[in-house]
Amino acid sequence: MAGYMVLIWDDEAAWDAAGEQDVEKTMRAHRDFGARYAHALRGGSRLYPSGTATSVRHDRAGITVTDGVFAETKEHIGGYYLFEAADLDQALGIAKAVPCPHGWVELRPVMPGSEYRPA
């Protein structure tokens, strides 16, 4: 089994404009997703809006801490799931089932620490 992470990219303005029924429908879909894939899930959570983010940048001059997200973009990471799958095809099947009515998901394999090799 290999580890995978799904990053859930959302349009925050669409969520702000969504009605309570739309929000509850999506949260119910996430609960159903969690129940359906409980055997594979290893973690996941909804994230607070991007306005609560703090960016920490490392460069030759040192470390800079700033309020807010690192880039100006319409979509922001609204949550994530961490799970295990037998292969990429199975991981894609799980990723396609992630509820995301106001955005898209990004699937990435998780690199085991034993495979990390600094350049």
PLM region spans:
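Conserved, structured core segments of small domains
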Residues: M1-A119
